[in-house]
């Protein structure tokens, strides 16, 4: 399942001290970060993930970003999406 996460960043210093590639690769089995798009003003970021469920991703990511951001999750409609990476589109 493809999931987009919107991060409302409360603590930019803490949030951006984390390595996005490490966070993306450090989840439980079946959870993989694919893309990371931070805003230039560091107030928000959007990420694309692959995971078995929103709950599995939420359990991991809310813990990792605790105190740094508030996260909103939604499943991507892959049939209508544009530009999904090949691995995410499969």
Q: What does each model-identified segment do?
A:
Residues 1-69, 73-90:
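Short S/T/G/P-rich N-terminal loop/turn motif that feeds into the first structured element of a domain
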